[in-house]
């Protein structure tokens, strides 16, 4: 398993995608992944995650965009040096793709909103012949 990490505006985002064989049904074109996300606040300020925007791109180039408030029903406040972790999931109709995106955060001290990029990461299943990503 490969972890993907990217730091933007003093916020480090690490993603670990995991293919879920038990929930996938390849003969019905349903491939399922979970992904563990770790968000570390490396800034000196307290920040709050306001929203998320994801792009899920399958290996054929089909793009699905998802946006919403917070993550997993929360808008966590993350103090300087602290880490927030969560797990979520997605599915594709093909055996591989890529996810990427961004979070919108509020700096609670300056009252400024800023973006943090989510590293692009591969969604690969054992049903692909070669690793395209």
Swiss-Prot record:
Q: Where is the signal peptide?
A: none
Q: Name one GO biological process term.
A: error-free translesion synthesis
Domain ApaG: residue ranges:
5-130
The record's Pfam families line, in alphabetical order, gives: DUF525
What InterPro entries does UniProt report for this protein, alphabetically?
ApaG_domain, ApaG_sf, Uncharacterised_ApaG
Q: Which NCBIfam families match?
A: PRK05461.1 (NF003967)
Q: What is this protein called?
A: Protein ApaG
Organism, per UniProt?
Wolbachia sp. subsp. Drosophila simulans (strain wRi)
Q: Which gene encodes it?
A: apaG
